[in-house]
């Protein structure tokens, strides 16, 4: 849980005691080997010299996936090269894939589906330059901790529960809840 969850409970009248207990992470703190990186890049035909972003989680619109796709479409339209790994599955998967096609992002997005193998998951986090996690729905994003265990910073919405404890530019990156802000932050990071 998070401090933001407690604040929400207080707003609806909860007056009892509480304990804030952030999510733990069972992924070991590790660096992914050069061989593992090369294997994943070959598997998905990822060029060596492009920024690599990752979204990990359920494929549902209320996680603000549309903001990610709109920001990436802006980057593409500005002539920026990058790849976005979409790792997970969910009820809105087909609609998200349709939006990817509509935005002209098919050549930029790598769809992995659900990955259960923890070592393979480590590899995807490890090759990524940045986790994109603009969800304002999640109370305490486990994926942020998983990415951090692989030395991959996260881009989060300022003021969201997932962003609690993140220092902008030091332990992650913060933006406002908009595609333009995500794009601006990505442009700054890519420079």
Residues covered by each model-derived region:
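Carbohydrate-associated surface elements
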Residues: 4, 24
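Short acidic/histidine- and often glycine-rich active-site loop of Leloir-type glycosyltransferases
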Residues: 20, 158-169, 173-174
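Conserved donor-binding/catalytic core segment of Leloir-type glycosyltransferases
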Residues: 47-63, 69-72
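Nucleotide-activated donor-binding/catalytic signature segment of Leloir-type glycosyltransferases, i.e.
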Residues: 97-115
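Short hydrophobic beta-strand element within catalytic cores of glycosyltransferases
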Residues: 153-157
């Amino acid at each position: 849980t998070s401090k933001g969850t407690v604040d929400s409970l207080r707003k609806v009248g909860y007056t009892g005691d509480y304990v804030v207990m952030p999510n733990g992470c069972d992924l070991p703190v590790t660096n992914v080997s050069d061989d593992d990186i090369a294997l994943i890049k070959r598997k998905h035909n990822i060029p060596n010299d492009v920024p690599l972003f990752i979204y990990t989680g359920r494929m549902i619109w209320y996680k603000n996936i549309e903001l990610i796709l709109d920001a990436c479409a802006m980057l593409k339209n500005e002539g920026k090269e990058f790849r976005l790994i979409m790792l997970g599955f969910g009820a809105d998967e087909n609609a998200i894939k349709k939006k990817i096609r509509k935005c002209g992002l098919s050549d930029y997005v790598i769809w992995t589906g659900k990955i259960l193998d923890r070592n393979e998951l480590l590899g995807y986090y490890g090759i990524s330059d940045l986790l994109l996690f603009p969800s304002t729905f999640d109370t305490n994003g486990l994926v942020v901790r998983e990415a951090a265990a692989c030395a991959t910073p996260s881009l989060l919405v300022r003021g969201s529960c997932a962003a609690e404890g993140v220092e902008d530019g030091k332990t992650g990156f913060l933006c406002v809840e908009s595609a333009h802000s995500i794009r601006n932050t990505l442009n700054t990071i890519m420079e």
